[in-house]
Design a protein with these regions (language model features):
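Short cysteine-rich clusters marking metal-coordination/redox-active sites
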Residues: 133-137, 146-149
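Short active-site-adjacent structural elements
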Residues: 86-89, 120, 143-144
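Short, flexible, mixed-charge glycine/proline-rich loop motifs
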Residues: 119-130, 136-141
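Mid-to-C-terminal catalytic subdomains of enzymes
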Residues: 21, 61-113
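Active-site adenylate/phosphate-handling loop in enzymes that bind or generate adenylated species
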Residues: 1-65, 143, 148-156
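Thr-Gly-centered strand-to-loop micro-motif
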Residues: 55-57, 79-80, 134
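Short alpha-helical scaffolding segments that buttress acidic/His motifs in well-ordered protein cores
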Residues: 27-28, 111, 115
Length: 156
């Protein structure tokens, strides 16, 4: 869905709002799940002509700083919390990393730096994942179905 909308707008890239907290949580969650592929994945945007590359301009800004900026500039839209959050691994990881960051400032940055260092030391052939096409909608994906079609399939 994002790719399609970005193509319709003739966009060069899609900027996401992922902040340092999100990035660090994802790194830890991938390792806790034993998902080495996702932990080390990077997509070759040349492998799918429909893929619009993602950029993360806030990935080195803390969630606290990002929210403060949004509040000061009237940019935040109140969003209800997902009722299933309490069951998600991310909630536990977020709480744990928040406590670590409070006790040992810089923890989140060190996690993100460590992940970048790990990726920089890996051979490109080990890191880059070729994108294919979703079997249902034809959008770029590293899986049989894209995330949107997976969600639709779960709902039906």
């Amino acid at each position: 869905a994002l790719n399609r909308a970005a193509r319709e707008m003739d966009a060069d890239s899609i900027a996401t709002g992922h902040c340092l907290d999100d990035e660090s949580q994802s790194v830890v969650m991938n390792y806790l799940r034993g998902d080495v592929t996702r932990a080390t994945a990077s997509f070759n945007s040349n492998s799918a002509e429909l893929f619009i590359p993602r950029i993360k301009p806030l990935c080195r800004s803390s969630e606290r700083a990002t929210v403060a900026y949004g509040l000061c500039n009237n940019l935040l839209v109140p969003l209800p919390e997902c009722p299933y959050t309490r069951y998600a691994l991310r909630k536990d990881v977020r709480t744990w990393l928040g406590k670590l960051e409070y006790a040992k400032p810089g923890t989140l940055t060190r996690i993100a730096d460590g992940q970048e260092e790990l990726l920089s030391r890996m051979p490109k052939s080990e890191v880059v994942t070729e994108l294919g096409r979703c079997e249902k909608c034809g959008e770029p994906t590293a899986n049989r179905l894209c995330a949107a079609c997976q969600q639709l399939e779960r709902l039906m």
